[in-house]
Every structure is written in structure tokens, then in C-alpha cells.
Amino acid sequence: DSAAAITLRRAEAPRPAIDTASAEAYRLTVDPETGITITGATDAGVFYGGQSLEAWLPVAAYRAPSSPVDVPAVQVLDAPRFAHRGLHLDVARNMQSVAAVKRLLDIMAFYKLNTFHFHLTDDEGWRLAVEGLPELTRVGGRRGHTLDEQAHLMPSYGSGPHPSPEASRGSGWYSRADYLDILRYAKARHITVMPEIDVPGHARAAIQAMEARTRRLRAAGDTTAGRAYRLRDPADTSEYESVQGWDD
């Protein structure tokens, strides 16, 4: 019947009397005669109206999703005060699975956050596979006990002795397919992914990884290729120590 209908509309939605990011404005109406109507100025506005409807549903709707529920009548006129509403996730120091990232994106969407600051690299890890530079993840994407860091980085942040991704959140990375999957998932929820690649500071994982690449290519007799992408200047004789105790 009409009371059970949900209508989605793209139109100029009325806005509260504040200075707002009007492109994401929406109106949510729950009416016993006409049903549920969500009107948004854009697709994002309609989407956010749907998120507000989810929040408005009684708890019974989640306890028994297939059972009928009574939805209280309401009219909501809403628009964001700030165009940029972000959340930051640091996976460089503590790796998170694709499934965990997607759960976070769902929570962001529910709270109408629209920018995901995805911290993919730092001193302690490089988490995005790059074609042609396997050491970035094979070396820079793993942490574990080591005497020379030639195969992987040393432990940090309680990552433990084992360098395998299955054993520690200090290890792991996203393949190209993983990353594209995350981008598509975010886009469907009107979230912009802002990848954060730290350079020139906070780049120790990349530096160590490129040193491993240089060693591999030199051992194969390709010194010229080994110099490409190297981040350490062998002629630099300066001495220093970082707050973490690193001198390389």
C-alpha cells in the first residue's frame, strides 16, 4: 500500500536556514498517508537521506529485518555545515584487511562522512603494491625479527617476531585489485578516498625497500637499473639519529 512506499527523488531540496554545502542537502518525509519520501539535490543528498532513514528506524527493524515495523512520522530538512567531513585510518603502522576497511566505510557513510584519509605508507610500512617495484611490499610491507632488515623491516608497535601477514598486523598490503575494490566501495557510498603517501619524511619503509631492490639488481649485474628509484644518496656523509633511534 502507499504507506509502505519509499520514493526517492532528485530535486532541489529545502535547506535549513544556515550556510550549508547545499549539493548534499536532502528532505526526509515519513507520512502515514503518502509513505516515505527522500528528496535530494544530488545523488549524494538522496543517499544521506537514506542513511537518516536507517537511523530513524526502530530497533525492531534490525532485530527482525523481515518483520513489519511501524516507522514514526517525521520530516527532516538537513544539509551539512562542512563540505569536507573526513576520517583518517593509519594502515601503515597497523595493517587492516579489506573487509575491515569496508566496515569502516560503512560506518563513515552512516555518519555522512565523505572523505577517507587512507594513510598507506610511513616509516613502519608500505601497504600498496606497485607494479614493477615488488620490494615496496615484499620488504617494506612486512615487519618481523631481523638482524639486517634485508628481507623485511624490524618489528614495531608490538607487531611481533613473525613477518607473515597472517601472523601480524605489522605485515600485509593491498594488491591493485584490492585497492580498486576499496575505491569502488567508497564511491558507491559517496566517499572520496584520499591516499596518503609520505615523502620525503616518514619514508623509511620505502627507503629500505629500494635498497633491497638495488642489491637484487646489482647481484644480477644490472647496476644502471639498480640506481633507478633508489632513495638513499650514497654520497651523503651526514650523521643523524631520529627520535625512533634510526640513523639510516
Where are these regions (language model features)?
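Contiguous, structured surface segment used for ligand recognition
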Residues: 1-84
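Second-shell loop/turn segments in exported
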Residues: 36-40, 90-94, 168-172
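Aromatic- and acidic-residue-enriched carbohydrate-binding clefts of CAZyme catalytic domains
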Residues: 124-188, 203-248
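Generic beta-strand/beta-sheet core signal
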Residues: 90, 118-121, 194-202, 232
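Aromatic/hydrophobic pocket-lining residues that form the small-molecule binding cavity
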Residues: 46, 101, 175, 179
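Short, well-ordered coil/turn segments that N-cap beta-strands
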Residues: 83-85, 112-114, 187-193
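Conserved hydrophobic/aromatic pocket- or pore-lining residues that grip, position, or stack substrates
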Residues: 42, 108, 193
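A conserved hydrophobic secondary-structure block that centers on an alpha-helix together
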Residues: 87-123, 127
